[in-house]
Amino acid sequence: MRIGLHVHIAGGYVKAVEHAKAVGCKAIQVFSTNPRTYRTSATDFAALDAFAQLRREAGIDPCAIHTPYLINLASTDAKIAQGSLRLLQADLAVAARGGMRFVNTHLGSYGTRDRTEGFTAICRALESALSKIEPDVFLVLENSAGAGNLAGGTIEELGALIRALDHPQLGVCLDTAHAWATGYEINSKEGVDRFVERADREIGVARILMFHFNDTQVPLGGSRDRHWHIGEGNIGFEGFRALLAHPELRDKTAILETPGNDEDDLRNMQTILAIEKGAVSC
């Protein structure tokens, strides 16, 4: 797998790439803008070009953009729905300009809306975004932790979206903490095998483009989005070892979104790389 971190760019692209390289990243994920606003900022083309060059020099590829948290493609509020689509389209444009392969997005919440109507609204929004997607960029739908009426919590629902849209540049990101919170028992080889088999059946393993590797202290099926340090939660060493060793997943990208500071980033990267190399026992 190409393993890396979500890195912050508030200190500039140079520092972000330096940090990623220092902790052993082969891939990275970033926010292109403030993740907690519907406002989009003007694109700094020179900075994007410099960022791409820095990544090439560091051997870091692919790069993913994570869209803002506020996106809700199922909303009945026209301002929210339209603002969400604008954010998604903006990140797809930035990715194309900056040589970033993936744009990873949450889908939002159905709220009190009929789920069939909400599903149709999500499909329409994604169809609109995909109609303008540039070559070499992939739109990646992330599974939710299953809380409340969040969209995309199950493998079956993600698969239904993939089939409904049937677009070659549409894929899926599977977050391990979210999967566990939804009830997928991925803390053993047997559990991971069942999970991957189910995902292949419903989504197609070729459509699984990314993973978010996060441990969690949430109980199985707890429906809460809480990330924790690799190997220190309920998924544990055995779960991540099984994911890393699975033959169908070896060409995938895995991004850590673990909590903490730069020292925690280094510790989590060292742990996941040691698991990959077989240096950590279960």
Across the structure, where does each feature detected by a protein language model lie?
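N-terminal pre-domain/capping segments
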Residues: 1-67, 71-90, 278-282
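Active-site beta-loop-alpha junctions enriched in small/polar residues
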Residues: 6-10, 31-35, 68-70, 108-110, ...
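Aromatic/hydrophobic pocket-lining residues that form the small-molecule binding cavity
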Residues: 13, 48, 84, 88, ...
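Acidic (Asp/Glu)-rich catalytic clusters
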Residues: 18-25, 44-64, 89-99, 127-136, ...
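Conserved, mostly hydrophobic/aromatic
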Residues: 20, 66, 84, 95, ...
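Active-site acidic/histidine proton-transfer and metal-coordination neighborhood
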Residues: 56-57, 73-171
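Acidic/histidine-rich catalytic cores of soluble enzymes
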Residues: 123-228
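C-terminal helical cap(s) of enzyme catalytic domains, especially alpha/beta-barrels
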Residues: 262-281
